[in-house]
Design a protein with these regions (language model features):
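Acidic catalytic/metal-coordinating carboxylates
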Residues: 36-40, 63-66
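Active-site beta3 strand of CheY-like receiver
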Residues: 48-54
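Non-catalytic signal-transmission and effector/linker regions of two-component phosphorelay proteins
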Residues: 1-7
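Short amphipathic alpha-helix used as the core "switch/output" element in two-component signaling
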Residues: 43, 65-75
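Receiver (REC) domain active-site loop signature in two-component systems and cognate sites
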Residues: 59
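Two-component/phosphorelay signaling modules centered on CheY-like receiver
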Residues: 15-33
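Alpha4 helix (beta4-alpha4-beta5 surface) of REC/receiver domains from two-component response regulators
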Residues: 66, 87-95
Length: 95
């Protein structure tokens, strides 16, 4: 019987650029579900369970922070790692 793989949801509008990181995690035994928008991330959280979520802050449509608030209503105990290129302290404090 195969061991359960930890499941990662990764939401980023530039997900194609993250392919090497996704492949690395998959090689380490993680199941990675990539999505390209905040709404896609919310929909996935409604349909599936995840062990951790990587969430880009700067996405078209819902921002990462807006998406985070919806995800925390659906799956309050799942850890979320906010990912951003921005060094604005206000974004870090809000997250």
């Amino acid at each position: 019987m195969a061991a359960k793989k930890d499941r990662v949801l990764w939401a980023d509008d530039e997900i194609d650029l993250l392919k090497p990181h996704i492949l690395f995690l998959q090689d380490k035994g993680y199941e990675v579900v990539p999505v390209v928008s905040g709404q896609d991330a919310i929909d996935c959280c409604k349909e599936q369970s995840f062990d951790i979520i990587f969430l880009d802050e700067n996405m078209p449509g819902l921002t990462g922070l807006e998406t985070l608030s919806h995800i925390k209503e659906i799956a309050p105990n799942v850890p979320v790692v906010m990912v951003t290129k921005s060094e604005e302290e206000s974004i870090m404090n809000q997250a």
